[in-house]
Amino acid sequence: MLGFFAVYGNPITHSKSPFLHNYAFTKLGLSGYYSRILLDKGANLRQNFLSNGLSGANITLPFKEEAFNQCDEVRGVAQNIGACNTWVLEDKNHLVGYNTDAQGFYECIKEYKIKNALIIGAGGSAKAVAMILQSHNIPTTLINRSVQNLSFFVHKGFECYVNSEFKPTCSYDILINTTSAGLNDNLLPCDESQLKELCSCGKYAFDLIYGKCTPFLALAQSFHLSCSDGKEMLINQAALSFELFCKQKYNKGNLEIQRIASFMNEIL
């Protein structure tokens, strides 16, 4: 048995991760099982993981920073991001954290030839997106509804503003919503007039929310921006996580990321 896996979040009923991972297990002939777990408090994340006997997990909103703080070791880009979306249990109780959101996002936009970017939000997903853009030398600005969480980005050298104080002084090639606005409501991630001004001179709009046309994307479409939801990013990060879940017990030569992603794309 490869093991039991799950995705943690709140809310979590919308998550398609179980479909993706269980389908990939089936296609590859692996005896793994993946489910969803609703968690009320992030402080209980590690305890819940261990008590459920999981071998690995994905972590989504709003627990990615908690996941970073509660694992025993952090590897790869997650060390700079300060947020983990993937946990893998090594040995008996050694919990290793990774971030596959960053590369999963970049795979979606690497062909866009972006000169600069604006990120809306300042949570764990924003950290992943911002840091991968910075690693590719793409100037990036962040805006958030409050000053909370912006200090991380300021220390990393990003230009940051509170929404109410932000006045665009240039156009941005891509607008990226990393907030939960539009997931279970009809809210925009920032003021409508502000967003209209940004869309009027933008090229691309990307919403990390997947499976629906959010108010953010609907507004961007009305300005004829090229729009993408988070489906491709979901598949990319899931395939990267899947490889991490399996690599200790499965022949890595058969775990090409693109092959896993193609399986997952069949089911979503």
Swiss-Prot record:
Belongs to the shikimate dehydrogenase family. Shikimate binds at S15, K16, S17, T60, N85, D101, Y210. Keywords: Amino-acid biosynthesis, Aromatic amino acid biosynthesis, NADP, Oxidoreductase. It comes from Helicobacter hepaticus (strain ATCC 51449 / 3B1). It is an enzyme of class 1 (oxidoreductase). CDD domains: NAD_bind_Shikimate_DH. One of its GO terms (cellular component) is cytosol. NADP(+) binds at G121, A122, G123, G124, S125, L208, G230. The active site is at K64. This is Shikimate dehydrogenase (NADP(+)). It holds the Pfam family Shikimate_dh_N. One of its GO terms (molecular function) is shikimate 3-dehydrogenase (NADP+) activity. It comes from the Bacteria. InterPro entries: Aminoacid_DH-like_N_sf, NAD(P)-bd_dom_sf, Shikimate_DH, Shikimate_DH-bd_N, Shikimate_DH_fam. It catalyses: shikimate + NADP(+) = 3-dehydroshikimate + NADPH + H(+). Pathway: Metabolic intermediate biosynthesis; chorismate biosynthesis; chorismate from D-erythrose 4-phosphate and phosphoenolpyruvate: step 4/7. Its EC number is 1.1.1.25. Homodimer. Involved in the biosynthesis of the chorismate, which leads to the biosynthesis of aromatic amino acids. Catalyzes the reversible NADPH linked reduction of 3-dehydroshikimate (DHSA) to yield shikimate (SA).
